[in-house]
A protein has these predicted regions:
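Structural and coupling elements of P-loop NTPases
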Residues: 1-693
C-alpha cells in the first residue's frame, strides 16, 4: 500500500447492535474494494476481522480489529468493533481512534439498544456518524420501518442518501438521492436504470421526490448561502449536495442513512463512494487538545511537519509475538528506531517494528504519517499512553471505560498455579481496561471483575488457551462480621501443670460494644493483680481472637475490651499463658454478650429507562433494598434510583439489570456500612460458615 498524507486517510469505526452485520459489512467493503480476493463468512469462521478462536467459536466479534482498503484517492482504516455489551471496552477503543462511525442497523430488527449505545458513544466523543441499514436481502427486512424508527429515535438530523426501490417485497434497484439516479445490480455490478414511478413510490411508503427534497432541506441548513439558494427555489448542484452533507456531518447536524446487502454486495459500491466523498479525513476532524508538562492546554493539529505526537488506544498481550500497541498518530510522523517520550510516564524509549494489520495478517510499514493508525511491536507502553517527540511533550486525555461490575471468585484448578494466574491477569489487564483482578482481604479470595458473563467466559478462556492455566469460578463469599450487643465481665483462666514449670495466667476482662471497627483495648488493673509486662500478651491474645467470631467465624468489630483484674504465679506465669487466658475470656465473653451477625450494606445508584422504574423498585424490594430516592437522569428517558442493598443480594444484579432493560441500564455499587443480619437469615449463614469451637 502506498503512502498517504493526512488529507487522504479516513479512519472508520463500524459499530452497532450485536448481530446487525458489522463484520459482514467490513468483509463486503474489503472485498468490493479489492483489498481481499474472497468474501468471508461468519458461519464459515473465515472473515478477516473475526479471527481469534473465541470469535470463531462464538460467531461474533469479541475484539476490535484493524483492516484497511483503498477507495478513490483514499486509504481507509476500518475498525470493526464488537456489539455485545460485555465487550463495550473494545468499542470505546475503536470509536475513540476513528474519525467517523458507521452504525449498522438491521433491516430486519431495526433500531435496538446497541444502536443507541453506539450513537451515544460516537456523539460523546464528537464523531460524525452515518447509519447503514443492512440485511436488506432478508425476506422480513423493511427499510421504510427502519427509516421511520431512525427519524423518531434520532431526530431531524437523519437524512437518507441511498434508498432501496421495492416491488413485491423484493429490492429491484437503489436510488442515490445525491446523484438522483437509480441503479440495479446484475452479477454484482451496478447498472443505471429508470427512476421509480410515483405509483411505485407510493407502494413503498416513501416518495422518492420527497426524500430528494428532504436532502436539499438538510443541506440548506449547513450554510447561509445554500439556505438562501434553497428558499429562492434553485436546485443544488451535486457538488453542493456533497459538500453540504460533508459539512453537516462534521458539525453534527446531518446523519446520513444508506443501505446495503453484504451478502450479494448490492449498495456496497455506493457506500464506498460515500466514504470517499462524504466522510471527513483526519486533517479536518482530528485536531486534538493536549496538555503540556506545565499543565497548559495546547491544540495539536494534524500536520506532518509538526513534532510527532500519538496516542495508544489499544493493547494486545500476545504471549508469542509480545505486546502489540495500536497507535493513532495525531501529528508529525512515527518511524521505527525513533526515540520518543512517553508523556504519561515520563520515560523515553525507541520505537520498534511498525506494522499495519489486515485482520491477523501483519504488513511491515516504514513510517506512519499523521492521521494514520499503526501497530508498534514490543513497545513498553500501555493503553491511554501518549508518546511524542521531545521537541514538544504533550499528553492527551485518556479514554473513559465502563467499570467492571460482574464479580466472581477465581481459584486455580491445579495447585501451584496461583502465580501463573497473577502473571497472566497482569498481561490481560494491560490489554483490557474493563477487567480487574485483586485480593479481597476480608474473604481472602481473588476476585475477577468483568462487564458480564460472556466477558468472564472470554477471560477464563484466554487464561486457559493463551496462558495455559485453568481456573474455577464461584460466587464471591460475603464478608460478614460479628459484634456484641451488651456489656459483660468474664474470667479467663489458663492453668496447666505437667512436671517442671507449669503455665498460669488469669484475667478478668470487661467486654462492651463500641463504634470502632478495630479492637479497643484498655487496662484498669489495680494493685498489680496482673503485672504490666503481661498486658501486651493479653492484648495480643485478644487481637488474634477477634479474627474469628463465635457464631460463624467471621471477624469481630465494634468490640472494646478492658482488663480489670486477674492473678499470676511468680514461676508459672508467662506471656503465652496470659495470651491463652485472654483467648479463653474472649470466647466466654462473646457467648454471654449476645453476639450478632452483621452483613455488609452497599450504596446503589442504578439508571434505568423510565418504563422500567416500577420493575426495578419491585426488584429492589425483593432484594431487601431500601429505596432512598429517584432522580431524573441527564439522559432523556432514564431515571436514577438510589438505594441501599445488602451485598449478599447483588451477586446476579448485573445480569438481571441487563435482561430487564435490554442492556440500557447501568449502575454503581459501593460498600457503605454493616447492619445486623435479619433473624430469619442468621441460621442459614451460620450453618454454611460454622466454625468448630
Amino acid at each position: 500500500m502506498k503512502k498517504y498524507d493526512s488529507t487522504k486517510i479516513k479512519n472508520i469505526a463500524i459499530a452497532g447492535q450485536a448481530g446487525s452485520g458489522k463484520t459482514s459489512l467490513t468483509e463486503a467493503l474489503l472485498y468490493k474494494s479489492g483489498a481481499t480476493d474472497r468474501l468471508g463468512k461468519i458461519t464459515d469462521g473465515n472473515t478477516v476481522s473475526d479471527y481469534t478462536p473465541d470469535e470463531i467459536k462464538r460467531k461474533c466479534s469479541v475484539y476490535t480489529s484493524l483492516s484497511s482498503l483503498e477507495t478513490g484517492e483514499f486509504k481507509v482504516n476500518l475498525l470493526d468493533t464488537p456489539g455485545m455489551f460485555d465487550y463495550e471496552g473494545e468499542a470505546v477503543e475503536g470509536i475513540a481512534a476513528s474519525g467517523c462511525v458507521l452504525i449498522t442497523v438491521s433491516g430486519k430488527s431495526g433500531v435496538r439498544v446497541g444502536t443507541h449505545k453506539a450513537y451515544d458513544l460516537a456523539k460523546k466523543m464528537g464523531k460524525p456518524t452515518m447509519f447503514v441499514v443492512t440485511k436488506l436481502d432478508d425476506d422480513n427486512a423493511n427499510f421504510n420501518n427502519v427509516l421511520t424508527q431512525l427519524k423518531a429515535e434520532f431526530g431531524p438530523t437523519v437524512c437518507p442518501v441511498v434508498v432501496p426501490v421495492i416491488a413485491d417485497r423484493k429490492i429491484v434497484s437503489y436510488v442515490n438521492l445525491i446523484e438522483m439516479k437509480a441503479y440495479k445490480y446484475e452479477d454484482g455490478k451496478a447498472v443505471e436504470t429508470d427512476m421509480p414511478t410515483a405509483e411505485v413510490s407510493e407502494k413503498m411508503g416513501y416518495r422518492i421526490d420527497g426524500l430528494i427534497e428532504a436532502v436539499s432541506e438538510a443541506v440548506a441548513e449547513t450554510d447561509e448561502a445554500l439556505f438562501e439558494k434553497f428558499f429562492s427555489g434553485e436546485a443544488f448542484t451535486q457538488k453542493e449536495l456533497i459538500d453540504g452533507i460533508h459539512s453537516g456531518m462534521n458539525s453534527g447536524i446531518i446523519t446520513p442513512v444508506t443501505c446495503v446487502s453484504s451478502t450479494d454486495l448490492s449498495g456496497v459500491d455506493m457506500l464506498l463512494k460515500e466514504i470517499d466523498l462524504l466522510l471527513p479525513p483526519p486533517s479536518e476532524k482530528d485536531a486534538m487538545i493536549g496538555e503540556t508538562a506545565d499543565g497548559e492546554a495546547v491544540e495539536v493539529a494534524c500536520v506532518e511537519s509538526d513534532p510527532m505526537s500519538a496516542f495508544v488506544f489499544k493493547t494486545v498481550a500476545d504471549p508469542f509475538v509480545g505486546k502489540m500497541s495500536y497507535i493513532k498518530v495525531f501529528s508529525g510522523k512515527l518511524t521505527p528506531n525513533k526515540e520518543v517520550v512517553n508523556a504519561t510516564t515520563g520515560s523515553t524509549e525507541k520505537v520498534g517494528k511498525l506494522v499495519t494489520l489486515q485482520g491477523k495478517k501483519q504488513i511491515d510499514v516504514a513510517e506512519a504519517g499523521c492521521g494514520d493508525i499503526v501497530v508498534a511491536m514490543k513497545m513498553n507502553v500501555n493503553t491511554n499512553d501518549t508518546i511524542c517527540d521531545s521537541a514538544r511533550v504533550v499528553k492527551f486525555a485518556p479514554m473513559t471505560f465502563p467499570k467492571p461490575c460482574y464479580k466472581m471468585a477465581v481459584r486455580a484448578k491445579k495447585q501451584g498455579d496461583e502465580s501463573k494466574i497473577s502473571a497472566a491477569m497482569t498481561r490481560l489487564m494491560e490489554e483490557d481496561l474493563t477487567i480487574d483482578y485483586k485480593l479481597d482481604p476480608s474473604t481472602n479470595e481473588m476476585i475477577l471483575s468483568t462487564l458480564g458473563g460472556l466477558h468472564l467466559d472470554s477471560v477464563v478462556g484466554r487464561l486457559a488457551g493463551t496462558f495455559g492455566v485453568e481456573v474455577e469460578t464461584s460466587v464471591p463469599k460475603i464478608s460478614y462480621r460479628e459484634t456484641i450487643r451488651k456489656k459483660v465481665k468474664v474470667q479467663g483462666r489458663h492453668k496447666k501443670q505437667s512436671g517442671g514449670h507449669g503455665q498460669y495466667g488469669d484475667v478478668w476482662i470487661e467486654f462492651e460494644p463500641c463504634v470502632s471497627d478495630d479492637l479497643i483495648f484498655e487496662e484498669k488493673v489495680f494493685g498489680g493483680a496482673v503485672p504490666k509486662n503481661f498486658f501486651p500478651a493479653v492484648e495480643k491474645g485478644l487481637q488474634e481472637s477477634v479474627k474469628k467470631g463465635v457464631l460463624a467465624g467471621f471477624p469481630v468489630v465494634g468490640l472494646k475490651a478492658i482488663l480489670v483484674d486477674g492473678s499470676y504465679h511468680p514461676v508459672d506465669s508467662s506471656e503465652m499463658a496470659f495470651k491463652m487466658a485472654a483467648s479463653i475470656a474472649y470466647k466466654e465473653g462473646m457467648r454471654q454478650a449476645e453476639p450478632v451477625l452483621l452483613e455488609p450494606i452497599g450504596y446503589l445508584s442504578v439508571f434505568v429507562p423510565d418504563d422500567n422504574t416500577g420493575d426495578m423498585m419491585g426488584e429492589l424490594n425483593k432484594r431487601r433494598g431500601r429505596v432512598l430516592g429517584m432522580n431524573p437522569a441527564e439522559k432523556k428517558g432514564m431515571t436514577e434510583i438510589v438505594a441501599e442493598v445488602p451485598m449478599a443480594e447483588m451477586a446476579d444484579f448485573t445480569l438481571l439489570l441487563r435482561q430487564m432493560t435490554q442492556g440500557q441500564g447501568v449502575f454503581t455499587f459501593e460498600k457503605a456500612r454493616y447492619e445486623p443480619l435479619p433473624a430469619n437469615l442468621v441460621a442459614d449463614v451460620i450453618a454454611k460458615n460454622a466454625v468448630a469451637d
